[in-house]
């Protein structure tokens, strides 16, 4: 899963994702404005995307 953030915010957001300790997430790699989220199983991708969408709702 790839997530785009505001410039210079990817590392902070990746740290927050890592701290959630979701079993489906193996880990994250963050650049300046992009995060790669490694998901354990292909079948878990839709669940993870759904969780991120819920977190981003206003």
Predicted ranges, named:
Residues 51-57:
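C-terminal output/interaction extensions
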Residues 1-49:
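Non-DNA-binding regulatory cores of transcription-related proteins
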């Amino acid at each position: 899963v790839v997530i785009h953030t505001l410039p210079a915010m990817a590392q902070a957001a990746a740290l927050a994702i890592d701290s959630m300790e979701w079993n489906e997430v193996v880990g994250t790699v963050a650049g300046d404005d992009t995060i790669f989220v490694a998901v354990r199983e292909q079948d878990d991708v839709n669940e993870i995307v759904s969780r991120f969408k819920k977190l981003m709702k206003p």
